[in-house]
Amino acid sequence: MESGPRVEPGPGAPAAVLARIPQEPRPSPEGDPSPPPPPTPMSALVPDTPPDTPPAMKNASTPQQLPLEPVSPTGQVSPQPAPPPDECPSSEAKSRGPTPTATGPRDAKPSQRSSQPSPTAVPASDSPSAKQDVKKAGERHKLAKERREERAKYLAAKKAVWLEKEEKAKALREKQLQERRRRLEEQRLKAEQRRAALEERQRQKLEKNKERYEAAIQRSVKKTWAEIRQQRWSWAGALHHNSPGRKTSGSRCSVSAVNLPKHVDSIINKRLSKSSATLWNSPSRNRSLQLSAWESSIVDRLMTPTLSFLARSRSAVTLPRNGRDQGRGSGPGRRPTRARAGASLAPGPHPDRTHPSAAVPVCPRSASASPLTPCSAPRSAHRCTPSGERPERRKPGAGGSPALVRRRLEATPVQKKEKKDKERENEKEKSALARERNLKKRQSLPASIRPRISTGAELSTKSKARPTSPSTTWHRPASPCPSPGPGHTLPPKPPSPRGTTASPKGRIRRKEEAKESPSPSGPEDKNHSKSRTAEEKEPAAPASPAPSPVPSPTPAQPQKEQSSTQIPPDTAVPAVPTVPTFPTAPPTAAPSVTPSKPMAGTTDREEATRLLAEKRRQAREQREREEQERKLQAERDKRMREEQLAREAEARAEREAEARRREEQEAREKAQAEQEEQERLQKQKEEAEARSREEAERQRLEREKHFQKEEQERQERRKRLEEIMKRTRKSEAAETKKQDGKETMANNSGPDPVKAVETRPSGLQKDSMQKEELAPQEPQWSLPSKEMPGSLVNGLQPLPAHQENGFPAKGTAGDKSLGRAAEGLLPFAEADAFLKKAVVQPPQVTEVL
């Protein structure tokens, strides 16, 4: 701080010095004799001035605060007087604008400088400006504070509005989320309800299906049970040895022997079709081949052989014991077959299900109610025992009838040969018939039905093949059992050819069908048929021991049977001719062996055998005849169908050829008609063109004639006009000559010689008049000569130029002029008016050909 007084520049100081004055250090407020009011702090003034205020605006009030400064030379603003103190601050603020023009520190500097005493400045002049500056600063601070408060209020209101909008948006979003969650929950509940309803419907449907399947199976089981029970009581009711019906059992069997195979076939077919076929063809099997536990148990029960079935298949037990002894004494060749039959019986579907009193795997459902139990249980035990125990079981009956054994051994070789031939023929015939039947069925049905029908045919043929053994064994007890008396001996019965080959033939047929039937079907049908054959062979196994009691002296026959049963499925059985020859037995064998044959024919075994063989032969011949007739009828039908088809094809071909011929004929006629039409149209076109050409030529000629005629008329009119003009000129020339002569005479006689000279025509005028007379006249539309400008007007000749109103210019003699006018009209006295002769020429028409 300087202790001395500060020197301030005078009024004439330059601007540079004045610019450096604010840079000097300020005196402290304590040293000032009259300190100004304390300035506003910097922090309160800084927000009032915006940062983009230019420095010129900030220093705008500096010239007013320095009254001692001179007027700035160039570019300086001249100092203006300060506004009066009583001005309203609002008007000052409005005039200054929204932004303040000066800051606090810059405004405070002049006040501090002006408060200091200076030798040149007047002290009284600085105090009002300082007060005004302080007052302005306070007003500015107040305005700035008000603006800040308003700004804060505006921001607070804006923030409140923004917060309110945010709250509204948040509430709306929450509401939308709740609505969406509610809709999703409703959809989930609806889906669960639908799923629950669907599951309930499916469960009810499954229960209904299960009840329906169970009811169907129960009905089939009940019906099968009723039929089996009825047939069981009717078949085996009198098989007990000590029953009173024993005496009539032989006659009953002999009476029903012929009709029995068909009866047994139908019963067993019904049984199989109503039990196993129902299960295999049920809708549950269509869904899955795996059966449930209760279904498999029912299938096992139905497929297990019953006592009645075993009794029927083992009806050879009713033969006399001597026959069985004969079969046992026939040699060791029968034992492999018996052992094989027993072995085939032993493994049943369920070996653990055995009767408490028998060792046979029979179904327990027939153990209680079957009347066959007392007699069939020991027989079945006898049939199922191993081959080593059989001699002990048959020993008691071996020594009872030595005569029968001896007579059996004495059987003639002719009968043995006949039996073998018949066996071979029967086997060949039936295998060939089975093959032909299958082929016919397969050929007669369409391809879409073959897989189903092949399976059904397989089932039917298998079911038919199974009861062959019981059907043949029912023929054996045709002769009653002989009494044990010593004197009653019977001749040996020749073995049944059908019974000996029943089991091998059935097996061969089953193998052939298993080989042929799966071929049109798919792999599923193959597996199905294999499983069916495996299940059907198990209950069919008891049928195989049927031919066991048939005797044969040599082991060749069992070996042949065993080889025939072991034929692989690939080997083809040779075909047989359509009408085979049958060897007949010698007629002397029967009377030589049967000397004591009764009249009824039912007690003699040989007679019964012969009758049975005869019936079989007749039936076979009848079957062959029917088959041959069927074949012939089929061939005839086939030929007729072929002929019908050929005739239809020929008729169709003829119709097609006729249709083609008609179409070709129609096409030719149509083409010819079109050609004729084209020719006719062409001819008409040519004729029309010729007619048009002729018409055009005729019109052209007419036009030419018309033009020639018009030209001729025009020439005639021209000639007449020329004649008229010539006459008119001649009369005018003569008249003018006379007048000229008279005028010259008058002029010569007159006192004035000048007028006579003037009136006399000159030589030039006379020459021109002569030339005009000699010139050729123009046509009617040409203009007249100069001497006669209006020669003819409506048939009147106008007066000459020197006459006016019919009188001469000098008007000496009027009667002469009248006479001339009359002479001028003379040429028209003989002809018509001129306008009447005027012909309007037609327009030229140019024709384009």
Swiss-Prot record:
Entry keyword Cytoplasm: yes
Ubl conjugation as UniProt keyword: yes
One Gene Ontology CC term in the entry: microtubule cytoskeleton
Region annotated Disordered, chain positions: 1-151, 186-210, 318-815
Phosphoserine carried by residues: 72, 95, 115, 118, 125, 127, 256, 275, 315, 368, 401, 444, 448, 454, 460, 479, 496, 544, 548, 552
Gene Ontology annotations of biological process type: microtubule cytoskeleton organization
Main location: cytoplasm
Key words, A-Z: Coiled coil, Cytoplasm, Cytoskeleton, Isopeptide bond, Phosphoprotein, Ubl conjugation
Linked residues for Glycyl lysine isopeptide (Lys-Gly) (interchain with G-Cter in SUMO2): K462
Subcellular localization, as worded in the UniProt entry: Cytoplasm, Cytoskeleton, Spindle; Cytoplasm, Cytoskeleton; Cytoplasm, Cytoskeleton, Microtubule organizing center, Centrosome; Midbody
PTM annotation (Phosphothreonine): residues: T49, T53, T99, T120, T554
Record's compositionally biased regions (Polar residues): 457-474
Protein's job: Microtubule-stabilizing protein involved in the control of cell motility and neurite outgrowth. Facilitate microtubule stabilization through the maintenance of acetylated stable microtubules.
Protein name (Swiss-Prot/TrEMBL): MAP7 domain-containing protein 1
